[in-house]
Amino acid sequence: MITKIEKYGATWCGPCKTLDKTLEKVKNIEIEKIDVDECPGDLLQEKSIRNVPVLIFYDGVLEIERTVGAVSLETINNIIEKWK
């Protein structure tokens, strides 16, 4: 079960802004937004963040799925349903 989504993005990134609007429609899941320009480089390396936007889906502390790019609400909902 997905308990949290981490979104890695940047203020200058157009697709990241689009994804932010999509994430506003996701309910009942914690969403943490991380600006790659403001976080330590070692975190980005640890999480293997090379492009933005990236969504990482978690079940507790375990990463269970990841997307890259401005994915649709349908894609996000399909991932959530897949892990119910």
Residue ranges and their predicted role:
Residues 5-6, 31, 55:
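Hydrophobic beta-strand anchors of alpha/beta hydrolase catalytic cores
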Residues 14, 38-39, 71-74:
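Short alpha-helical
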Residues 21, 46-47:
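Chalcogenol-based redox active-site neighborhoods
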Residues 47-58:
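Structural micro-motif
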